[in-house]
Amino acid sequence: FASNHGVVNQGVSPFPPEVTQQMVWNFEAGGAAINQLCETAGLELSVTALDLNRPTIDFTTAPAMDPDEVVHAMNAGASAISETCDYLIVGEMGIGNTTSAAAMSMARFGGNASGWVGPGTGLDQAGVTHKAMIVQAAIDRHGDDQEDAVNLMAAYGGRELAAIAGAVLEARMRRIPVMLDGFISSAAASALTVGNRLDALDHCMISHLSPEPGHMRLASALRKQPFLDLRMRLGEASGAAVATMLVRAALATHNGMATFAEAGVSNKE
């Protein structure tokens, strides 16, 4: 899922917002990392762009979205899952969305802004410090007492984050296991746990631990153990695609490996 964020006007990313559209074109042309990983892992790729020419509002000045926009994006995420899907990985593209993910995580689980933000797409230390100030300003404006997932995402989220939450919720309804990517998709899914309903994500796994400082805190808060720690920070669901190959290996071993009795191997005495 892809969308743009108004908070980039605050200088929280070294890349301009038009990169989001350019990367969507790259996905569609088959030239991105996720295209190669999906082919290798035997995954079908679907790309959903959400109003790229209409960024969310800068959430330091007002809520990022109104509740109707959040619900619309969640429905788009739910609708993106094909009828034949039996395993879902989710990822995102959106310049500025690590700032949104950090703000959502802080609003949901508390702590200091400096503990949730990181370099994202390549900020230096001064940029990370500035980013923490932006997240803190947003929390000061909107508060951390959002009573449900929709209000939380309306205050701080992006359309692609809401779409991920909608897809994760739809997968829960359809009993489809979900492999989350990194920090951003984990933050999007965490919105569904408002009210301390961590069991809302019982069908979800976290594929890998992102180097973004907030991801370890978030995974711990969600009581999830990421499968891999490869220092990946690309996004695009790339970590989830790599972890899928581990899942395939586990299934192949489970289904094909003979028991000691079947293989005629003597057991311990």
Task: Go through the PLM ranges and name each one.
Residues 1-269:
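N-terminal loops that bind phosphate or other acidic moieties
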